[in-house]
Amino acid sequence: MISIKNLSKSYDDHSGHQKVFENVSYEFGDKGAYSIVGSSGSGQTTLLNLISGLDSFENGTIEVINQNLSILSVEERSALRKKYFGFGYQFHYLLENLSIYENCLAANFGIDTGNIDKTLKKLGIENIKNKLPSKVSGGEKQRASIARALSKKPSILILDEPTGNLDQENSLVVQDFLLEYAKTNNSLIIYATHDVAFAKRADKTLNIIERNIVQE
């Protein structure tokens, strides 16, 4: 479903020219859970942004569902994301003027409200669905962000530190739900995490080492 071939990515910062990836190749399957680990600043979030078409690269190709991202326009990449992707981040980006339920409904386009209710319940936040984001805790916002990402049943789910703001109990609830979701819905879930135990629960773990992707 996602194919990376001979990818190189770099950027300039206050320290000079920094290489993030150099001649990297990897094939993600059509389904299953993939975790991405690495030291701080190694490129976990950059990799997520690259495969979802949110960031550019110098050399190589990334194909998503047989579409070459490097030749797609900004509008075409956006359309691809809307059709196939769901996103959940450590920092939630919920619409503050909408309730938790309405945030999910907006992402779902009002197609399947039953799926929204089911997801909120499994994530343990059905009791806050009518509250505004400003009225709930950081951990609840993070789970709401995941619920919103899943509300349209995406083929590809991209998650950046999905359990970063959660206590151990709620972290396990989210982990169990996501891994079961990947199995029962034949979806591809790719998540970056610094939680070693959570990373090891994935079907495959990718470690970013010295500008390369190494499957453990």
PLM feature spans:
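Helix-to-loop junction immediately C-terminal to a conserved catalytic motif
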Residues: 52
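Conserved ABC transporter NBD signature motif
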Residues: 60-68
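Conserved ABC ATPase "signature" region
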Residues: 68, 113-128
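ABC ATPase NBD coupling module
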Residues: 69-86
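Conserved ABC ATPase signature
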Residues: 132-142
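A short, proline-enriched helix->beta-strand linker immediately N-terminal to the Walker B motif
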Residues: 151-155
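Catalytic Walker B motif of ABC-type/P-loop ATPase nucleotide-binding domains
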Residues: 157-160
